[in-house]
Amino acid sequence: MVKAGNETQISEFLLLGFSEKQELQPFLFGLFLSMYLVTVLGNLLIILAAISDSCLHTPMYFFLSNLSFVDICFASTMVPKMLVNIQTQSKVITYAGCITQMCFFVLFIVLDSLLLTVMAYDQFVAICHPLHYTVIMSPQLCGLLVLVSWIMSVLNSMLQSLVTLQLSFCTDLEIPHFFCELNEMIHLACSDTFVNNMVMHFAAVLLDGGPLVGILYSYCRIVSSIRAISSTQGKYKALSTCASHLSVVSIFYGTGLGVYLSSTMTQNLHSTAVASVMYTVVTPMLNPFIYSLRNKDIKGALTQFFRGKQ
């Protein structure tokens, strides 16, 4: 922290992480390193399967490979820095590093939400309008949906970062988290945060609530269409088509709600940090397993790819 006149220029923050007990640090390092490697490897395998097998060159797997890429980036935004801090027994993150981490966190969390909405729309078209699926979900529309998702996420991230850069911080520079989270940084500010809170809550309603409404609407229509199917086998096939996506959506929004409730209902900041692990680390790690465990196409594509390499 560098002082100049009456102004305070922040040079670094302290990330408190989970525990200050030294005996737990090797365990935490091994745990999060393992989870990070599983996340990267699992999502890379999904991308590899979607690229290598021409049978998987469909809208569903195009969106899934994009989601896997975003999950890798999402985990890489936070976990490597946390591992470095644990290994070096340091809690320090520079001001520029903190703003950068916050910027990418906001970018990828919103992009995750938008891509899940796009995938819900894809499921809706596949089940409710199967005869027109290939016409509606054209390569041009698929590319446009992903592009718009990226643009909206980048613009929101830039806006959140710009208004955060206008904040002044006091002497309390401890972030009770393992990464620089937007809400925690606003709480640390000693200047007026009205604009920041307005922008943050407006973006949350628009870019988190909006996609959730879209997903719920899509699944309401999907359930109505499935109920109209006469055969039991047809109903089972339709349900199995969207089961994986519905599981991922439930985990994503369920853990997000858990983090929000834990931060508002408890004063234990470390418990909030632990709850956020489910949201930021565990969910990207589970996604490849959820999509591949019951997916014969992905299993077949990976088996064929590795057999071809032998």
UniProtKB/Swiss-Prot annotation:
Pfam family, any one: 7tm_4
Sugar attachment sites: N6
Bilayer-crossing regions: 27-47, 56-76, 101-121, 141-161, 199-218, 239-259, 273-293
Membrane topology: Multi-pass membrane protein
Cytoplasmic compartment spans: 48-55, 122-140, 219-238, 294-310
InterPro entries per record: GPCR_Rhodpsn (IPR000276), GPCR_Rhodpsn_7TM (IPR017452), Olfact_rcpt (IPR000725)
Gene3D superfamilies the record matches: Rhodopsin 7-helix transmembrane proteins
Signal peptide: none
Entry annotated with the keyword Ligase: no
A GO molecular-function annotation: G protein-coupled receptor activity
Subcellular compartments: Cell membrane
Protein family per UniProt: Belongs to the G-protein coupled receptor 1 family.
PANTHER family per UniProt: OLFACTORY RECEPTOR
Job description of the protein: Odorant receptor.
Protein name, UniProt field: Putative olfactory receptor 7A2
Source organism of this protein record: Homo sapiens (Human)
Gene name of this polypeptide: OR7A2P
